[in-house]
């Protein structure tokens, strides 16, 4: 896996090409990502980078977290994220180093991971795009019902994994192959074409596209 960055969704806007074509873009702010730990095969059994970003009030940090940040010699951030490294990746990166948007200067496409917007408890029509039942023709109570979920005597039960009503959203989602429109090093911004998961100010993980 490639080295990525932790950013924050600012919102959406649009930019224009030289030909006057409007491109919808999502603006992602990437403050400096501080390396808090470098995991190795010898000490941890796998290779990875652990980073933090942003700030956190001192009274909201546990003793364990405070000790971990102090050991790395970095300012406490709002969270910890880990990125696996393949052989040969991350060479020369040490604890305390800071990663910024410049690492995406030559990147064409990225995968963006975030937590989708929570929708609460939803029915099958909204959650799974089920077709509604007849509005008339004798149907007066089950317009948006899931319908038959257990068949008849055989099998006479509901299979595991059956799409039904339930909690929708608020889960980790990755949008793949988003085109990088612009990298603004001065303002620590990345502009990607299209939408990314989650609400404004939500944390995002940006990595070079796996399928590019």
Swiss-Prot record:
It comes from the Bacteria. Methylated by PrmB. GO terms for cellular component: cytosolic large ribosomal subunit. The modification N5-methylglutamine is found at residue 153. GO terms for molecular function: rRNA binding; structural constituent of ribosome. GO terms for biological process: translation. The keyword Protease does not apply. Keywords: Methylation, Ribonucleoprotein, Ribosomal protein, RNA-binding, rRNA-binding. Gene3D superfamilies: 3.30.160.810, Translation factors. The keyword Transmembrane does not apply. Belongs to the universal ribosomal protein uL3 family. Part of the 50S ribosomal subunit. Forms a cluster with proteins L14 and L19. One of the primary rRNA binding proteins, it binds directly near the 3'-end of the 23S rRNA, where it nucleates assembly of the 50S subunit. HAMAP family: Ribosomal_uL3_B (MF_01325_B). This is Large ribosomal subunit protein uL3. It comes from Shewanella denitrificans (strain OS217 / ATCC BAA-1090 / DSM 15013). The lineage of its organism: Bacteria, Pseudomonadati, Pseudomonadota, Gammaproteobacteria, Alteromonadales. The gene is rplC.
